[in-house]
Amino acid sequence: GLEDCDFGWSPYDQHCYQAFNEQKTWDEAEKFCRAQENGAHLASIESNGEADFVSWLISQKDELADEDYVWIGLRAQNKEQQCSSEWSDGSSVSYENLIDLHTKKCGALEKLTGFRKWVNYYCEQMHAFVCKLLPY
């Protein structure tokens, strides 16, 4: 329930989420999430409902209005094989929502699609990001 998420975090389906308006590389963002109180991760997205929620969360945050990309926890382990991608929190990639891979290996949500579709982007680029944690 709501009472399980700390101030600043928003609940959805037994997890808590927060979009951060700090410019970080994918690795820095994942480290930042892990440093949060309960050891969060960059957000994994495992259903259409969760994708809608994360998109809504980003759009609610005025400081993110100028962001073109927002990091999520997807990272390709190997350029050629999408099937070896995984979420940074260890969730398996059973729900798929990608546009393309190329040689960009870190997952982001793209403003052009209303932060609704995943794109693979250059991991060293600096972007805002969304963390996700289990509240207990």
Curated annotation (Swiss-Prot):
Entry annotated with the keyword Metal-binding: yes
Main location: secreted
InterPro entries registered for this protein in UniProt: C-type_lectin-like (IPR001304), C-type_lectin-like/link_sf (IPR016186), C-type_lectin/snaclec_domain (IPR050111), C-type_lectin_CS (IPR018378), CTDL_fold (IPR016187)
Annotated GO biological process: regulation of cytokine activity
Record-annotated C-type lectin domain positions: 12-132
Cellular localization per UniProt: Secreted
Keyword Lipid biosynthesis: no
Tissue: Expressed by the venom gland.
Disulfide cysteine pairs (residue numbers): C5-C16, C33-C131, C106-C123
A cellular component annotation (GO) from this entry: extracellular region
GO molecular function: metal ion binding; toxin activity
Alphabetical UniProt keywords: Disulfide bond, Hemostasis impairing toxin, Metal-binding, Platelet aggregation activating toxin, Secreted, Toxin
UniProt-listed PANTHER family: MANNOSE, PHOSPHOLIPASE, LECTIN RECEPTOR RELATED (PTHR22803)
Subunit structure: Dimer (non-covalently linked) of heterodimers of subunits alpha and beta (disulfide-linked).
Function of the molecule: Elicits platelet aggregation by the binding to the C-type lectin domain family 1 member B (CLEC1B/CLEC2). Binding leads to tyrosine phosphorylation in the cytoplasmic tail of CLEC1B, which promotes the binding of spleen tyrosine kinase (Syk), subsequent activation of PLC-gamma-2, and platelet activation and aggregation. Binding to GPIbalpha (GP1BA) and alpha-2/beta-1 (ITGA2/ITGB1) may also induce aggregation, but this is controversial.
Similarity section: Belongs to the snaclec family.
Protein name from the UniProt record: Snaclec rhodocytin subunit alpha
Species: Calloselasma rhodostoma (Malayan pit viper)
Lineage, highest ranks first: Eukaryota, Metazoa, Chordata, Craniata, Vertebrata
